[in-house]
C-alpha cells in the first residue's frame, strides 16, 4: 500500500518512480484531490485550475486558496497519468 502524498511534486516523483501503479493510490482517500480525481474529467479539472479557488469548496474541505490549487493540480497530474496508462 502506498502512502498518500501531500504535494504535486511528491505525486510527480511517485508516478515517475512507478508508472505501473494507479496514480489515484497516491492520493489520500479523504482529500479534495481524490474527490476531484473521482468526480471531474481532466478538462473540468484543468478549467478549475485556471480560475480562482472556489470559496465554498475551500470552506467545505477546510483549505486555503493555495491548498485548493495544489489539490486540483494533484488531481490533474493523477488524471493525466491515468490516461497515459490506458
Feature-to-residue mapping (PLM):
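Short intrinsically disordered terminal tails
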Residues: 1-9, 77-86
Amino acid at each position: 500500500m502506498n502512502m498518500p502524498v501531500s504535494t504535486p511534486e511528491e505525486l510527480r516523483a511517485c508516478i515517475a518512480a512507478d508508472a505501473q501503479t494507479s496514480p489515484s493510490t497516491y492520493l489520500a482517500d479523504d482529500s479534495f484531490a481524490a474527490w476531484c480525481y473521482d468526480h471531474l474529467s481532466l478538462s473540468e479539472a484543468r478549467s478549475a485550475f485556471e480560475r480562482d479557488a472556489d470559496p465554498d469548496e475551500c470552506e467545505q474541505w477546510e483549505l486555503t486558496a493555495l491548498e485548493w490549487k495544489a489539490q486540483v493540480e494533484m488531481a490533474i497530474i493523477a488524471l493525466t497519468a491515468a490516461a497515459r496508462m490506458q
